[in-house]
């Protein structure tokens, strides 16, 4: 068997990659995160919107994987094929930043969890925590350098291991669930700080996106799949599995403790919910599960970060140095660039801990990472819609075209809703992070002797720059904060 064929990923590994990417730290903090924004009624409405929106997005990724198998790189490739080089670059850049910002947040949460057992790690932002996080970062880095397939196998093992505590949590809370607690204040009327039901639903949206980031994981690795048809299957199977886990964890928690009680919990709040039911050993169980979960999620996202930059560099949308692979067919330069950025921001976390805004480093990274991935998701959904409108690949399949048109239309509407729900603040902060990427885009274009921007791309870039300038001034003046 050749080295290339031995690196191919089967359906099980691809599905584990999707599940492993989505089940990181988010689900373990879900009870408090949701209760801080919404009560039971709004939570149920929000999950219904999320289920429909994210399922249509999963179906779009499945359809694109089947109908456009020649496109490698997922969100990046779809944006480029549909809307040009700069949109493709922007999707790659935004996805990449989202991924490694999420990794920084995961490192902080991991050592914050260890702080439950070893106070020296505090909330994940002490000297000891940053030093140990750095050691772990580079250990994962060199593991991935040994080969994509080897790391994917380890991810499969950690995915299975971390799901067990989640099922135990669900089973125990199912028996501890009390209907009178669940229905005590369905619409949150006793807590005016939550606002209207519409505001509650809107405020919980970024959290739902955060816990679903990774749904596109299999499509990013489409070029390494043993069967291209497995990419779509892995996306949908992974989505349904994670959706069930998320909804059960969230809803059952609200039948064990009230919304005000959940909102006041420290994270990982799932550990404290189980401790409330069964005692100290419950918190230990969930904390161990979280540690395994975070290690698996970090491994998944280290892989995804490098792969998206590598895919963009292969066709000259990113500079040439990012497409170089080592002897194990790993995009080594992309991996080095990614983890250097993570290392820098781990140091930044230490120096920005205790900011007067009161927001912890993990939450800041969560919100920024989520806002950065909204644009790549939008362009992927829009490309699915574009194919159906043009009839491309549907020449003899009118019925499928009509079905996919509806699905892609819903996915686009959902993506636009997410941009609205995220709010102007995070749209401007995203522009501030998107704008500097044009330097790499210009370098890549210079390497192949092409003009940097063409046509409408100039207007889009101008809008990004204006948004970035407004954000920069806002941070300076104080009307915007991270």
Swiss-Prot record:
Subcellular location: Cell inner membrane
Keyword Transmembrane: yes
An annotated GO cellular component: plasma membrane
Pfam families found in the cross-reference section: AA_permease_2
Cytoplasmic side: 1-10, 62-100, 146-156, 224-235, 305-333, 387-403, 447-458
Major site of localization recorded for this protein: membrane
Transmembrane segment boundaries: 11-31, 41-61, 101-121, 125-145, 157-177, 203-223, 236-256, 284-304, 334-354, 366-386, 404-424, 426-446, 459-479
Gene Ontology molecular-function annotations: arginine:ornithine antiporter activity; symporter activity
Catalytic activity: L-ornithine(in) + L-arginine(out) = L-ornithine(out) + L-arginine(in)
Annotated coiled-coil segments of the chain: none
InterPro entries reported for this sequence: AA/rel_permease1, Amino_acid_antiprt, APC_superfamily, Arg/Orn_antiprt_ArcD
UniProt keyword annotations, A-Z: Amino-acid transport, Antiport, Cell inner membrane, Cell membrane, Membrane, Symport, Transmembrane, Transmembrane helix, Transport
Topology of this chain in the membrane: Multi-pass membrane protein
Changes seen on gene knockout: Mutant is unable to utilize extracellular arginine as an energy source under oxygen-limiting or anaerobic conditions.
Alphabetical GO biological process terms: arginine deiminase pathway; L-arginine transmembrane transport
Periplasmic side: 32-40, 122-124, 178-202, 257-283, 355-365, 425, 480-482
Gene3D superfamilies: Amino acid/polyamine transporter I
Source species, domain of life: Bacteria
Function text: Catalyzes electroneutral exchange between arginine and ornithine to allow high-efficiency energy conversion in the arginine deiminase pathway. Also mediates the proton motive force-driven uptake of arginine and ornithine, but the exchange is several orders of magnitude faster than the proton motive force-driven transport.
Family as reported in the entry's similarity comment: Belongs to the amino acid-polyamine-organocation (APC) superfamily. Basic amino acid/polyamine antiporter (APA) (TC 2.A.3.2) family.
Record protein name field: Arginine/ornithine antiporter
Gene: arcD
């Amino acid at each position: 068997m050749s080295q290339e064929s031995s690196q191919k990923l089967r359906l099980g590994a691809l599905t584990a990659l999707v599940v492993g990417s989505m089940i990181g730290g988010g689900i373990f903090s879900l009870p408090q995160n949701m209760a801080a924004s919404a009560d039971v009624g709004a939570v149920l409405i929000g999950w219904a919107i999320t289920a429909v929106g994210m399922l249509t997005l999963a179906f779009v990724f499945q359809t694109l994987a089947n109908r456009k198998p020649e496109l490698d790189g997922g969100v990046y490739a779809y944006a480029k094929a549909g809307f040009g080089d700069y949109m493709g670059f922007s999707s790659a850049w935004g996805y990449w930043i989202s991924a490694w910002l999420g990794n920084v947040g995961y490192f902080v949460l991991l050592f914050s969890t260890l702080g439950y057992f070893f106070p020296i790690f505090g909330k994940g932002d002490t000297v000891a925590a940053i030093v140990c996080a750095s050691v772990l970062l580079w250990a994962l880095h060199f593991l991935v350098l040994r080969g994509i397939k080897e790391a994917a196998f380890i991810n499969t093992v950690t995915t299975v291991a971390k799901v067990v505590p989640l099922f135990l949590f669900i089973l125990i809370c199912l028996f501890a669930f009390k209907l009178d607690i669940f229905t005590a204040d369905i619409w949150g009327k006793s807590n005016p700080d939550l606002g209207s039901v519409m505001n509650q639903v809107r405020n919980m949206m970024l959290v739902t996106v955060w816990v679903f980031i990774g749904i596109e994981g299999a499509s990013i690795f489409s070029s390494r799949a043993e069967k291209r048809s497995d990419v779509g299957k892995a996306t949908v199977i992974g989505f349904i599995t994670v959706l069930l886990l998320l909804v059960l964890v969230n809803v059952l928690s609200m039948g064990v403790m009230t919304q005000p009680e959940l909102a006041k919990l420290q994270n990982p709040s799932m550990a404290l919910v189980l401790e409330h039911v069964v005692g100290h050993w419950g918190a230990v169980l969930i904390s161990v599960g979280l540690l395994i979960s975070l290690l698996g999620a970090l491994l998944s996202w280290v892989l995804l970060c490098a792969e998206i930059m590598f895919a963009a560099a292969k066709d000259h949308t990113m500079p040439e140095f990012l497409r170089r692979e080592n002897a194990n067919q790993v995009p080594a330069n992309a991996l080095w660039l990614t983890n250097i950025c993570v290392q820098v921001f781990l140091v930044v976390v230490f120096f920005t801990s205790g900011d007067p805004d009161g927001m912890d480093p993990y939450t800041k990274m969560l919100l920024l990472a989520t806002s950065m991935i909204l644009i790549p998701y939008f362009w992927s959904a829009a490309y699915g819609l574009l194919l159906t409108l043009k009839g491309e690949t549907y020449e003899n399949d009118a019925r499928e075209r009509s079905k996919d048109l509806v699905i892609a239309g819903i996915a686009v509407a959902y993506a636009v809703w997410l941009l609205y729900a995220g709010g102007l603040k995070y749209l401007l902060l995203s522009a501030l992070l998107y704008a500097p990427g044009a330097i790499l885009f210009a370098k890549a274009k210079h390497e192949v002797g092409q003009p940097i921007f063409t046509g409408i791309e100039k207007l889009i870039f101008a809008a990004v720059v204006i948004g970035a300038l407004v954000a920069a001034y806002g941070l300076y003046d104080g009307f915007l904060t991270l």
